[in-house]
Structures are given as structure tokens and as C-alpha cells.
């Protein structure tokens, strides 16, 4: 089946496009009711790779199609991981066009996933994008001249994960403070005996 849906975001196309390029965009757009969890987001919309976790230990690997990429206007992701690739046969084209009221965002999906499931997911994505972009516009006068570096505790929880994603899509750098096994972009900390240099280079602690 195929599904095409469009909506207008009240912001310039360049701003909406840039928002999608930032780490955290995928997390912000993933519905909490969907059985998927973002693991890594592509560092490039042109030819990067995104990984999502599914139930039963399965992974959804989406590769971006360079041949259908137009900077500022269009990017495409295709599911490439077995067995999901055969089951879903997923291809998603994201398009951005100038509109008198801002940006016309069009999502075109070709897949075997039932349409009923997709409609609720894309309705959530549309409203979330509008809400996030509108929020950034409302606080624009409060934004610092230079991006901040924010250390976040509890970043693996529902609220912490959402906050971290919102900060990065706003252009700030987030350092996650974790108890063990830190990955790139994370720092290990002991809340009872933190390292003296734990917050080096950090502007804000949450």
C-alpha cells in the first residue's frame, strides 16, 4: 500500500529542514504508543543509517537513499534489515516545500504495513513537529547567542530522553550522565562521589 500525507508547519523551510538534520529529531517524532524505540539517528540525511529497536530483539535499520536526496527539499529512507525488510517493504520520502504560511511537509510511504497503523503515527508526527517548531519560535528571544552544553541526568527515562531530544533539536549539545557503560556523548558519574571534572565544559546541569 501507499500513503501520502501533507501538513503545513508555520516556519521557514530552511528552519524546518535544519530541525530534521539534528540529533533528537527522530526521538521527538516517534509516538510513545508505537512499538519502536530509536537507538541511533543518521548523522546525515543524504546517506546515513538510522536504527530502531523493535519487540523480540528485532532491529529496524533504515538507510538513506543518496540518489533521491536534495538538500533542503527531500530525503528518503529505506528499510534494509532482515526480516523486517521483507515484511514491511518500507520506503519513506520526506519532502519540504515553501508555502505562503511556512513549509509544506509531505510524507510519502510505500509499505506493507497496514494503513490504519500508519495514519495514527503520522498524525502524531505532524502535530509533534508543529508543536516543537512553534515552541522554538516562542522562546526564540530567550535563546543564548551561542548553543549551550547541557548535562542531563536520568536521560534514559521517558522524560529525560524527550528533554534531551528537544534540547538537541533546539541546537544545543547534550551530555548524558549515566551510572555505567558510557557511550560517545555520555559521561559516567557516581552521584555520591562525582569526579571533579565531571562538569568540565558544561553550561547547564539538569
Language model features with spans:
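Hydrophobic ligand-binding cavity/cleft-lining segments
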Residues: 1-43
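Hydrophobic-ligand binding "helix-grip"
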Residues: 27-28, 32-35, 41-45, 49-112
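Residues at the starts of beta-strands that form the adenosine-phosphate
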Residues: 104, 149, 173
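A conserved amphipathic terminal alpha-helix motif
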Residues: 109-146
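N-terminal Rossmann NAD(P)H-binding glycine-rich loop of SDR-like oxidoreductase domains
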Residues: 148-170
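N-terminal Rossmann-fold cofactor-binding loop
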Residues: 177-181, 191
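Conserved Rossmann-fold cofactor-binding substructure of NAD(P)-dependent oxidoreductases
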Residues: 187-204
Amino acid at each position: 500500500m501507499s500513503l501520502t500525507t501533507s501538513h503545513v508547519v508555520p516556519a521557514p523551510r530552511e528552519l524546518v529542514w535544519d530541525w530534521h538534520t539534528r540529533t533528537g529529531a527522530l526521538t521527538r517524532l516517534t509516538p510513545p504508543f508505537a512499538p519502536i524505540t530509536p537507538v541511533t539517528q543518521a548523522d546525515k540525511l543524504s546517506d546515513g543509517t538510522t536504527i530502531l529497536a523493535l519487540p523480540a530483539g528485532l532491529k529496524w535499520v533504515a538507510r538513506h537513499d543518496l540518489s533521491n536526496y536534495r538538500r533542503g527539499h527531500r530525503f528518503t529512507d529505506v528499510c534494509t534489515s532482515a526480516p523486517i525488510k521483507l515484511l514491511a517493504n518500507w520506503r519513506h520520502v520526506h519532502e519540504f516545500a515553501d508555502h505562503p504560511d511556512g513549509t509544506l511537509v509531505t510524507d510519502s510511504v510505500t509499505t506493507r504495513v497496514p494503513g490504519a497503523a500508519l495514519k495514527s503515527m503520522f498524525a502524531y508526527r505532524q502535530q509533534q513537529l508543529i508543536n516543537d517548531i512553534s515552541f522554538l519560535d516562542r522562546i526564540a528571544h530567550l535563546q543564548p547567542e551561542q548553543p549551550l552544553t547541557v548535562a542531563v541526568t536520568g536521560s534514559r527515562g521517558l522524560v529525560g530522553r524527550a528533554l534531551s531530544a528537544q534540547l538537541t533539536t533546539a541546537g544545543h549539545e547534550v551530555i548524558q550522565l549515566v551510572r555505567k557503560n558510557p557511550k560517545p556523548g555520555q559521561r559516567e558519574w557516581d552521584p555520591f562521589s562525582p569526579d571533579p571534572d565531571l562538569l568540565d565544559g558544561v553550561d547547564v546541569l539538569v
